[in-house]
Structures are given as C-alpha cells and as structure tokens.
C-alpha cells in the first residue's frame, strides 16, 4: 500500500482529477445553473453564484466562447 502512495502515476492521476474538476466539471455545472435560474434567483443564491464564478473563473473563461447565455428571442426578426 505504501508503494501506491509513493507512486508518481497515482499522483499524476490525482492532479488530472483535481484539475479536470476545477476547469471542466464545476464550470459547466455553473453555466447550466446560471442559464436555468438567472431570472428566478434569490439574493443569497445570486451571491453564492457570484462567489463561485469568482472562484472558478479560469474554467468559465475556457467555455465562454462556446456557450451562449443570452435570452432567447421571440422568433420575430
């Protein structure tokens, strides 16, 4: 068991897991949450979301060119 903890492969897997969670999983969840709840959030929920946006800003920047959070139009135009 001790060789597992001293193994550089296990360390690499742990780093990949932490970085992918920080840069991919949580920012995508935040985008989903903000897109669905933006107009009905309470003040404390909005404050919490703003804090999470500040905390996970690098991951949100990675996805910002690909995701559109603008309101949907009425279809006329």
From Swiss-Prot:
Per the UniProt record, which residue ranges are transmembrane?
Answer: 12-32, 47-67
Q: Which UniProt keywords apply?
A: Membrane, NAD, NADP, Plastoquinone, Quinone, Thylakoid, Translocase, Transmembrane, Transmembrane helix, Transport
Give the residue range of the signal peptide: none
What reaction does this enzyme carry out catalytically? a plastoquinone + NADH + (n+1) H(+)(in) = a plastoquinol + NAD(+) + n H(+)(out); a plastoquinone + NADPH + (n+1) H(+)(in) = a plastoquinol + NADP(+) + n H(+)(out)
Q: What is its EC number?
A: 7.1.1.-
Topology with respect to the bilayer = Multi-pass membrane protein
Q: GO MF annotations for this entry?
A: oxidoreductase activity, acting on NAD(P)H, quinone or similar compound as acceptor; quinone binding
Q: Origin, by domain of life?
A: Bacteria
- Function (record text): NDH-1 shuttles electrons from an unknown electron donor, via FMN and iron-sulfur (Fe-S) centers, to quinones in the respiratory and/or the photosynthetic chain. The immediate electron acceptor for the enzyme in this species is believed to be plastoquinone. Couples the redox reaction to proton translocation, and thus conserves the redox energy in a proton gradient. Cyanobacterial NDH-1 also plays a role in inorganic carbon-concentration.
The name this protein goes by in its record = NAD(P)H-quinone oxidoreductase subunit L
Where does this protein come from, organism-wise? Prochlorococcus marinus (strain MIT 9215)
Q: What is the lineage of its organism?
A: Bacteria, Bacillati, Cyanobacteriota, Cyanophyceae, Synechococcales
């Amino acid at each position: 068991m001790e060789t597992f903890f001293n193994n550089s492969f296990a360390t690499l897997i742990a780093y990949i897991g932490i970085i992918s969670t920080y840069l991919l999983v949580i920012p995508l969840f935040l985008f989903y949450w903000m897109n669905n709840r933006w107009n009905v959030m309470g003040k404390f929920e909005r404050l919490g979301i703003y804090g999470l946006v500040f905390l996970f800003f690098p991951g949100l920047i990675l996805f910002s060119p690909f995701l559109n959070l603008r309101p949907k139009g009425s279809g006329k135009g």
